């Protein structure tokens, strides 16, 4: 496997110098490029990210309910947020993708970018230890933790349901109208049907749940107009 270029620059951006660069190389390698890809590291990093953010929120909001803490954590560790961090790090410049993913613009795909951030967290853990991961993750999330609040953390589907119930309207209907791609990299197209709108609103994402949330968010925006 060819070495990934400009690794020293990426390490400066991350704020961490790897003892074993092989961990970072693997974290940046998509399954389309090699059998030694980043999915196991992603699994590890996902768990570490969850505990670090959970711990930070628990201490930052001593009076918040379990529901509020869960919603804030979901906001902070969601694919969209992780992809934003990846873009800040310019991770797309360093990813190793197979020819098909390169051609289709995989270095810009939210799910691939988000997975790479989690894989890097897993790689840092294996190269060092949990406390180093904690300090780095908290540094990466510093500005986001400063502005997160327990209020307004309900997801779009919940907000839409509550809005319709308030006005005694029928609940929305979500319908998967199309799926595309291999099992590990599927794209879901979901329609959200609401009585007050003349046509269904469509959401597209890497999972059914995310596609439903995307469609619900669009419906909420339309109902504000």
From Swiss-Prot:
GO terms for molecular function: double-stranded RNA binding; metal ion binding; ribonuclease III activity; rRNA binding. It is found in: Cytoplasm. Keywords: Cytoplasm, Endonuclease, Hydrolase, Magnesium, Metal-binding, mRNA processing, Nuclease, RNA-binding, rRNA processing, rRNA-binding, tRNA processing. CDD domains: DSRM_RNAse_III_family, RIBOc. Coiled coil: none annotated. Residues 7-129 form the RNase III domain. The active site is at 46, 118. It catalyses: Endonucleolytic cleavage to 5'-phosphomonoester. Mg(2+) binds at residues 42, 115, 118. It holds the Pfam family dsrm. Residues 155-225 form the DRBM domain. Its cofactor is Mg(2+). Its EC number is 3.1.26.3. It is an enzyme of class 3 (hydrolase). GO terms for cellular component: cytoplasm. GO terms for biological process: mRNA processing; regulation of gene expression; rRNA processing; tRNA processing. Homodimer. Digests double-stranded RNA. Involved in the processing of primary rRNA transcript to yield the immediate precursors to the large and small rRNAs (23S and 16S). Processes some mRNAs, and tRNAs when they are encoded in the rRNA operon. Processes pre-crRNA and tracrRNA of type II CRISPR loci if present in the organism. Belongs to the ribonuclease III family. NCBIfam families: RNaseIII. This is Ribonuclease 3.
